[in-house]
Every structure is written in structure tokens, then in C-alpha cells.
Amino acid sequence: MLFVTGLATLIALYASEYMSHDVGPGYCRFFAAFTLFVFSMSCLVMADNLVLLYLGWEGVGLCSYLLIGYFYKKPSAVAAAKKAFIVNRIGDLGLALGVWMAFVQFGTVEYAALFEKVGPFIEHAKAGRFDLIPWQVEAIALLLMVGAFGKSAQLPLYVWLPDAMEGPTPVSALIHAATMVTAGVYLVARMLPFFAVSEYALPIVAWVGCLTALLAATIGMAQFDIKRIMAYSTVSQLGYMFAGLGVLTAASSDPAAAAAGPYHVFTHAFFKALLFLSCGAVMHGFAGQLDLRKLSGVMFMPGWRIVGLGMLVGCLNLAGFPLITAGFFSKDMILAEAFVNPHMHAVGWLLLLTAGLTAYYTFRVFFRVFVGPQHFEPGDELHGHDDHSHDQHTTQHTAHSTHSDRAHDESASRGAHAHGHGDFHPHPPGWAINTVLAILSVGCFVAIVPYFVKWVPGIIEHSSAGLALVGGHGGEHTGAGHAHGTFLGFDPHAVMYYVSAVIGFVGIGVAFVLHYVGRTTAATSKADALLPVLGPIARWAQGKWFVDELYDAVIRVPLWVLAHVLHLIDKLLVDGLVNAAGAAPRAGGWGLRPTQQGQMHGYAAGMLAGVALLVLIGLMIVQ
């Protein structure tokens, strides 16, 4: 509740300036959906039963749909809203079935009663006797997991979140960085007893989180739209959180181990909101420009120092800069506990690789956009920001369309130069935006305090999660106790500080060399020299590994064809039979209509024909 309500207040203040262009019906519509979202999220967090949680869950889904599609006359925004809603339906179905099965199996949906009834199964799990646990309990955990993966954008249901950047930037900061997308992580943490007694749920959570983190990081490295880079970063960090829950709670009975995932939720809320709002300030001031190849040296332009410093603080936290950032400590906890679990070392190594990639793409944005030679080209929205004049703006604003070479050449021909673009002058953010960025920057450092005072472990120890900490779970479940893994022969808790620090420095250093050293223009960098070497890999990563295209080919197009075939069957066969039943008498009537002409000789001929027919039938019957 602390960061749901606190961050919502700050983002509302930010939005009061950011959305000031749209004072009128649009302004009211935005804040109506915004406040309804905060209510729904609060309902979700404060619920003491699964039904009330589900009510809040569906509420935030509805508000997300409304806010992503805020620019309802922009086709790409409408498509993104529908995509988010439909993909989340898959996860929500899993959650609904899980709630129903929990009620059928245990006769209640209240957390306290459910955890009391699942208590005996905890003992079976500790002993490694999963064969004594009913299959329905395993099914409940797996169904809840599907719901969590949908809402928190994990494989294979992550594709909706990057497209959700079509909504206004405050929406991205609140819903798709700080609160709603972490609802799935909250669900797993809240229902941890069910996951702890499941033989497969926690390992699946750990592996799906790990693979999602790595996949999203590779995509983020190759994007040029800074807002979408942060979106893929969010997907990646959510994967870290799930790995923290899947690996840490499975590896140790120590509440400090289980605290890593929830603590990363807490720290991530601050620095990712700061990053999104900093990107939004740039978008707001440069007419919607988000292409990192068309912006440079922003931090040193008049009026942009606070935005630049806020971005720097956010990047340091996301990259896990050692000792001074909350992001370092929360990420370090996850990495250490991944190696503590002797059965999850592969997950640990992949998370280490992801940490290095994260540091690289994070400072790729900072070095390209905020430092270096001063240069800017305004975006397509010279008359507004975030599609403020959406009544006229109907073109799709995606990374590929706005970053095309043709657009770059056309803008250059209109008078772009080293320090600007024609007569356009960027307008720095006002007091509301700067104040929010300053407060969030301070909050990123204050978020370190819970780590040292052991605040999160204390909460977990006295929560339902404390019941679910099963020693030795997540491996082979032998019931022989907890085996403590090592990192190259060393205690992970002792050395992971240094390992993660080195990984972070390497990522930042590579970004510094490739995107800052020797760069003379905004559009070029030393990284371009690697394209011939990385060729196909770079193209696939820039194409988001063509997952959307795969889903189109395997799921959307076949379903579209099937729907049209069924439509034709329904129209020609089903409707055809029904319509034929009415068409036959109508055709008979039209056929007999010429006999009704109002002439006596015609009627007489008809009567004679009828009498003759009756006589003929009578003779046939007699014979």
C-alpha cells in the first residue's frame, strides 16, 4: 500500500502538468480512470480473500484498457489497448479457475482459512512426500501462476506490455512500472503456501522469470525508442522478481532469503517510475521525440538539469551500481540466493548475464540521450505531446515508423542542425514535473533503508509466506534438509556483492566505450561497427525476436481463418436452412400469385382444374 498510494499521489501531481494540454473532457476522463485504478489496486492489495482480490484484479485490468486506449482516435493506441485486454484475459481465466477450485476444494476463499487448511500439506512437502498432497492443490498453484504470468507480463504472455506504451507516460509510470504489473508477483507472494506445497510450481516460476528477464534484456538492447526500452526493462525486472520468489523461497527457510523478490518489487517501483517519468519529460519537451538517435546532450540544455540527474539516478539503480543504490542490494539478494539453491545454479548464471545486459542498455540510453554533443530533432507532435491533438493524429507512432531513414532525411531537409531543428525550441518541464522527479530521486536512496533494518524479512516472517518457507524445496525434494550451494566454491552471500558490482561496471563500461567515447553526432556510435559482426542477431533482437509475428502466424491468423469459416458455415448452412423454411412458402405464394387476376374465366378454369384433380385422385383411390 505504501508505494501504491504514495507513488500514485506523486504521479497524479506529475500528470496535472503533463496532461494540462487536454483540460476538458479528456482531462476528466484521464483522471477518472486514474483514480479508479488506484482504488482497484488498493482493493487488490488490502483484500483478505481471493474473491475481493479478483475484483481488484479485474478493476485494474479495466482501467489499464481505458488508459492505454486514452487516445481512442489513434489506431495504434486502440490496437494496444485491445491487445492488453485480450492477452490478460488468458491469465485472468487461470486466476478465476484457481479461485473456483480453491473454493471447491476447501470451502472458503479467505486467506487465513485457506492457509490453515493447507498447513498439513506443508509438513508433507517438508518431508518430500508430494504424493500425499492432493492433485487439486497443485492445480490451484499452477492456475494462480497462469494469472500471475498474464498480469505481470511473463513468458509467453509478455507481449502486451511493450505495446502499452501507447498510453500517456504517467500511465506507463503508474500502471506498467510501479503497481499493476507487480500484481502477479504480489499474488504469488500472497499465496505462497500453495506454491510451497506444489512440486512443480516454484521451479516453473523461477525458470519462467529467469528466461523472461534474459529475453526482454536482449530485446531492450536493440531498441531505439527510449520509452519502449524502459518497457522491456520492466518485463526483464519482473522476471527477476519472479525468479526471486521461485528460487529464494525454494532454497532456504530463512525469511531474509524470501525477502529478495518482494524487496525488489519495492525498490523497482521507485527507480522505474523515475525512469519513465524522466522519459516522459523528454517526450513532453521535444514534441514526442523518443528516438535516441535524434537526441543528445539533453542534460546540459537550459532547464533540463533536474531531468538529467533524475535519469542518472534511475539508471544507476536499474544497472545496480554498488553500495549507493537500492537496486544493487535488491538485485544482489536475488543473485546470491539463486546460487544458494544448489539446484538453481543455471538460473543464477543466466540472471548474472541479464544483470550485465541490463547495465549496458540502461546506460546506452543515458550516454546517447543525456550527455554528449547537444543535438535534437523534434518529434511528430510539434503541436502537442503524447498525441495531445489526437483528433487529428491518426498515424501509428512506433519505433520503426518514427525511426525510419526517410523520416530522418526529411527532417534534415527541413533544417535540422547541430543544436536544434529549425525554429523549434524544446520547453523544459515545469515545477510539478521537476518536483516529482526530485522526490523520486531521493526515494531511490531512501529505499536502501529497509535492507539494513531487515524490514522486509520481518514482514515476511509474520506473514503467510513464513508458513511456506520449506527447507530444501525446489530441487529433488528428498526431505533430507537444506543443502547450501556455492558460487565457484565461495559462499554466495559473501562474494555476490563483488561479483554483481563487477558485472554492473562491465556493462556500464561497454556502454561508455560504445556510445560515449568519440561520439560526434547523435545518430552514430562505435556500436554501429559491430553490426556486420552481430548482423542476424542484432536484426532479430531489434525485431523483438519476431515473437509477435510468430503469435500472428500460429495463433491469430489460424483463429481468424477459423472464425471466417465458421461465419460462412453459420451464414450459408444454419441461416440457410432457417431462411429456406420461410422462403419455400413465400416462393409458393409468388408462384400462385398470377392466378389471382380478377377475371371470371380464369377462376372458372381454376375451379375445373381443381375438380378434375379431385376426380382423378378419387379414381386412383377406388382402383
What are these regions (language model features)?
Residues 1-4, 128-148, 347-355, 480-510:
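Hydrophobic alpha-helical transmembrane segments
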Residues 58:
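Short phosphate-coordinating micro-motif centered on Lys-Gly-acidic
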Residues 11-12, 217, 365, 507-517, ...:
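Alpha-helical transmembrane segments
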Residues 91-106, 312-319, 436-459, 544, ...:
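Hydrophobic alpha-helical membrane-insertion segments
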Residues 10-53, 62-425, 449:
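Hydrophobic transmembrane alpha-helices and their helix-loop junctions in integral membrane proteins
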Residues 181, 209, 312-315, 433-447, ...:
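Hydrophobic membrane-spanning alpha-helices of multi-pass integral membrane proteins
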Residues 272-279, 356-368, 503-528:
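Hydrophobic alpha-helical membrane-embedded segments
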Residues 427, 442, 453-500, 514-623:
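Aromatic-capped, Gly/Pro-kinked transmembrane alpha-helices
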